Regions:
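Non-cytosolic coordination micro-motifs
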Residues: 21-60, 64, 89-181
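Sec-dependent N-terminal signal peptides
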Residues: 4-16
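Compositionally biased P/S/T/G-rich terminal and signal peptide-adjacent segments
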Residues: 60-86
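Generic marker of residues within folded, mature protein domains
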Residues: 7-10, 80, 129, 139-141
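Hydrophobic alpha-helical context, especially transmembrane and signal-peptide helices
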Residues: 11, 21, 25-26, 80, ...
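Short linear interaction motif-like sites in intrinsically disordered regions of transcription factors
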Residues: 15, 72, 119-122
Length: 181
């Protein structure tokens, strides 16, 4: 069943990638970078789904604001104190139990698909170590917007192993670089 879900996910998620010229044209669950969460949810629903202090002082993150058949999870990031709730990040993905190799296979399929459709986007380097629990492959356009496809693997807690696809505005991506360093 998990494989079927993944293939449905791949087809539905990436069918609009091939025709998109910019990241804001890619839709995930109908939402896209630059759109407003208020187009889909009430302010109360947004606040209820927002996790406190994930990215202090700058951005807020909603968790599973919408039930979805395609993904195991979905998060949407917007700027703190933005009354329009402009979307700066969307992440979604599928959980993998304890076989990281399966995650890597699916990651490679997605990378190949993006590489064929987004020829003008370059990949960013990542220092890959054999024992790493996080393996991202990131595509960036000339404007700084990014698509990341990442495998997360934690042998001690298989409930959080996942293949994650993230769309990020330049502003959010730059913030993450500063925040994580």
């Amino acid at each position: 069943m998990k494989k079927l879900s993944l293939y449905i996910f791949l087809v539905l998620m990436w069918c609009n990638v091939g025709s998109a010229k910019e990241i804001k044209e890619i839709e995930v669950e109908g939402m896209s970078i630059g759109g407003s969460l208020l187009e889909y949810f009430t302010e109360e629903e947004i606040k209820e789904a927002t996790a406190p202090e994930v990215y202090p002082d700058k951005f807020e993150v909603t968790y599973n604001i919408r039930e979805t058949l395609r993904f195991d999870f979905i998060t949407v990031t917007y700027k703190s104190n933005d009354k329009k709730y402009k979307i700066h990040g969307i992440s979604t993905g599928l959980k993998f139990s304890n076989n990281i190799q399966d995650c890597y296979k699916e990651q490679n399929k997605l990378v190949e698909e993006i590489s064929m459709n987004w020829k003008n986007w370059g990949t960013l380097p990542f220092d890959d170590e054999d024992n790493s629990t996080y393996k991202p492959i990131t595509f960036e356009d000339g404007k700084g917007d990014a698509i990341s496809i990442s495998c997360y693997y934690f042998p001690e807690d298989t409930s959080i192993n996942n293949l994650k696809i993230s769309l990020s505005s330049r502003e959010f991506k730059n913030y993450l670089k500063e925040y994580l360093n």
